[in-house]
Amino acid sequence: MSEAGHKFLAKLGKKRLRPGGKRATDWLIAEGGFSKEKRILEVACNRGTTAIELAQRFGCKITAVDMDAQALEVAKKSAETAGVGHLIRFERANAMKLPYEDASFDIVINEAMLTMQADQAKKKCVMEYLRVLKPEGLLLTHDVLLKEAKESVRQELSQAIHVNVGPLTQDGWEQVM
């Protein structure tokens, strides 16, 4: 079986393992109103690149979760090396069943992970994000948007990155949200 595309790219040293790269992450950060006082949850943090950047820039406390134990170990080491290990708590958790109390976070950030989920799972994830957000909290996310629904595009993308994907059109994303 072939290795998932994002894991292969990580082995090559690529740090931004999502569509949109640093530019999309920078847009989310600019929209976030991050500060030291805010409690942040990053879902699907992978190797912790965004969490580390947020901790360095804003000094905020971050909980960063992922399902990949190996990626979390890399993330922990990277955060320590960057001098922000005390600000970030890395945990293994499922986005569809987050182990946090209701209204726990000011900001939930999630980058290009929902596309990797089936449609019903996308909705479950978003419902969990909203559950753990405080009233007036902010959900920051970006993902793959199709101009038109074409099964051939989905299949081609899945084959290219060796992961079953489900990108949506604007209408599809609006239904999920």
Predicted regions span which residues?
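Class I SAM-dependent methyltransferase Rossmann-like catalytic core
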Residues: 5-19
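A short glycine-rich, Lys/Arg-flanked "PGG" loop and its adjoining helix->strand segment in the class I
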Residues: 123-138
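A short acidic, Gly/Pro-enriched loop at the edge of an enzyme's catalytic core
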Residues: 96-108
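Short, glycine-/aromatic-enriched active-site segment of Class I SAM-dependent methyltransferases
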Residues: 144-164
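A short SAM/SAH-binding and catalytic strip from SAM-dependent methyltransferases
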Residues: 107-121
